[in-house]
């Protein structure tokens, strides 16, 4: 369990049980507040294998270095951050995605989440992520034909990935 002290009170958080409580009856002095954000969103890569017309991701390809990223995660954990959310681009396209999630879950007390387009979710990847991911978000921009027009991929393939 993690305890984070901030201007709103004392935040108790446990990524395993789901406990997430803010005790706001006590207002601690500023000198003891955690200086970290509660949650941090990290774009692991800006690489994506979809070509959505509305996407703001840059067209050059770049990914964060795994060891440097894990150093940041450990620092955030030590400073009181409660969780990290990986995004991108498409985070599953980072060459070390599963390893990063496993190490983040094993080497920190951070809740690990990610947002994906869902097309790369295979049984093998899901199996590798078990025990490391606290929840995943799948972006869905419509259904059927609307989805296919927006994303350029078959909606049925998204549904297969979500099974």
Identify what each model region corresponds to.
Residues 55-60, 146-150:
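Acidic/glycine-enriched edge-of-secondary-structure segments
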Residues 57, 65-66:
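Long, mid-chain structured domain cores
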Residues 1-59, 77:
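N-terminal pre-core extensions flanking Radical SAM catalytic domains
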Residues 66-86, 94-163:
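Radical SAM/AdoMet-radical enzyme domain recognition
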Residues 7, 11, 27-29, 50, ...:
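A generic structural micro-environment signature
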